[in-house]
Regions:
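Blade-level signature of beta-propeller repeat domains, shared across WD40, Kelch, NHL, RCC1
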Residues: 188-212
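Beta-rich, blade/repeat-based domains predominating
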Residues: 1-9, 17, 34-39, 53-71, ...
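Short, conserved, GDST-rich strand-edge loop motifs in beta-rich repeat architectures
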Residues: 11-35, 126-161
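A short loop-to-beta-strand structural motif that recurs across blades of beta-propeller domains
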Residues: 38-41, 81-83, 166-168, 206-208
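A beta-strand-loop signature enriched in Asp, Gly, Thr, and Trp
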Residues: 85-140
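Conserved beta-strand positions in repeat-built beta-propeller and related beta-rich domains
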Residues: 3, 9-21, 56, 72-79, ...
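A short beta-strand motif characteristic of beta-propeller blades
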Residues: 49-54, 98-103, 176-181
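Short loop/turn segments that connect beta-strands within beta-propeller blades
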Residues: 43-48, 86-90, 171-175, 211-212
Length: 212
């Protein structure tokens, strides 16, 4: 969820799959099934309307607005990228007209996003890039088998090695990569405050932090 300077509230639906077993299960399902049924919506409190901003996202799991509130960034879990679009746009399709890839080929599956006042975008990673998943991207059979497997087996397909990035800081002004954060923890939330950035670690009550 992200609130703009004009009071509008943007929120994401990760995908069309049921979330009866929780958001994490829904995200794993989207990675394996790659349905591309995620949507981002905007709520306008002025007239209490809800409109669709962009669809076709393979796991819409993070949102961030540029400092001026004009550009919306959306993390796409399944495509390992972050889309950017005009915050006032409506009914877009991920990768289609007026929706471009701001950062692609990411080293992991992006989750939460956070924006600083200077235009630095923080991208957290829920899982590291899965070689097995990428190798079998076109195998409906193998993906289907993995989809029906238990949670423990599915987690082993992804994981997060100790040397894998759990988050990165990038410049939205020139696209340069400013810093990589490692720590062996899968991140579900990221929040820069002052001289530190805080990370919510998956399956943990701890809040991690790093100086910036």
């Amino acid at each position: 969820m992200e609130a703009g300077p004009d009071g509008k509230v943007y929120f994401a639906v990760a995908g069309g799959e049921a979330v009866d077993n929780g958001l994490e299960a829904a995200l794993r399902t989207e990675l394996l099934a790659h349905t591309g049924t995620g949507w981002v919506y905007v709520y306008d409190p002025a007239d209490r309307s809800v409109q669709r901003v962009v669809g076709g996202v393979a796991g819409a799991s993070g949102l961030a607005l540029s400092p001026d509130g004009r550009t919306l960034y959306v993390s796409d879990l399944g495509n390992r990228c972050v889309w950017s679009m005009d915050a006032d746009a409506r009914e877009l399709t991920a990768g289609g007209k007026n929706c471009q890839s701001a950062f692609s080929g990411l080293p992991g599956y992006p989750c939460a996003l956070a924006m600083e006042a200077d235009g630095t975008l923080y991208i957290s990673y829920r899982w590291a890039r899965s070689g097995w998943l990428e190798k079998n991207a076109d195998s409906t059979l193998l993906r289907g088998i993995a989809l029906r497997a238990g949670q423990n087996l599915q987690e082993k397909l992804f994981g997060l090695p100790s040397d894998a990035p759990c988050a990165e800081a990038v410049s939205t002004a020139d696209g340069s990569w400013k810093r990589t954060f490692t720590g062996g923890s899968s991140c579900t939330a990221v929040c820069p405050v002052g001289s530190k950035v805080y990370f919510g670690a998956a399956d943990s009550a701890q809040v991690l932090s790093a100086r910036i």
